[in-house]
Amino acid sequence: LFERPQGGERAVLVRLILEGSEDPQEFAEFQELASAAGAECVALISGRRSAPDPRLFAGSGKAAEIREAAQAGAAALVIFDHALSPSQERNLEAFLQCRVIDRTGLILDIFAQRARSFEGKLQVELAQLRHLSTRLVRGWTHLERQRGGIGLRGPGETQLETDRRLLADRIRQIRLRLDRVEKQREQGRRARRKADLPTVSVVG
């Protein structure tokens, strides 16, 4: 469902030092997270800002530097070690002409790769969907590619409305599945408690 970093996917890593947030070890941790997600770092971009730029987070000058690094390294992905707003993510993707994910998306991706149980995978997908729901405006074409596209749209719906409906449907389905898993677990606990009760025989 998600366009996550593939093994060896070339990426530019961006971490800005904002006022009061300087910690050299955090950049090393960020690189380790990106590597764990399967990204191949082709460039590290850093800089200082007193506060994030409302439009491009890094500012137009730094964003231009990021774009040049992505083009030079043939990177189709830029990962920010910050939480980006939906509008910042959209603006950056339009400016950089490549996919952008923030720290939250990166961590959710790692969780998704490492989830083993059925319930764990559902919980991670639900978190990813909620994260994605605020970013629908950029055009969710990969969902149509995976599910066929034709026949999905309702009468008079715009693509954005279709995407939102499909997203809401999927979230609802996952919640129902998680509810069933929880009920099955509770039934199992009750059965085990019942099995542990001592059996008393009365001889008369």
Where are these regions (language model features)?
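Conserved hydrophobic/aromatic pocket- or pore-lining residues that grip, position, or stack substrates
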Residues: V78, L129, L167
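A charged, well-structured terminal subsegment
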Residues: L126, R130-E144
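Conserved G1/Walker A P-loop phosphate-binding module
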Residues: F2-A11, G139-G204
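Conserved residues at beta->alpha junctions
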Residues: H82-A83, Q123, G154
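Short hinge/gating elements
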Residues: V14-L18, A51-R55, L108-A115, G149-R165
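Short alpha-helix plus adjacent loop in nuclease-associated cores
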Residues: G105-L126
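N-terminal accessory targeting/assembly segments
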Residues: L1-D109
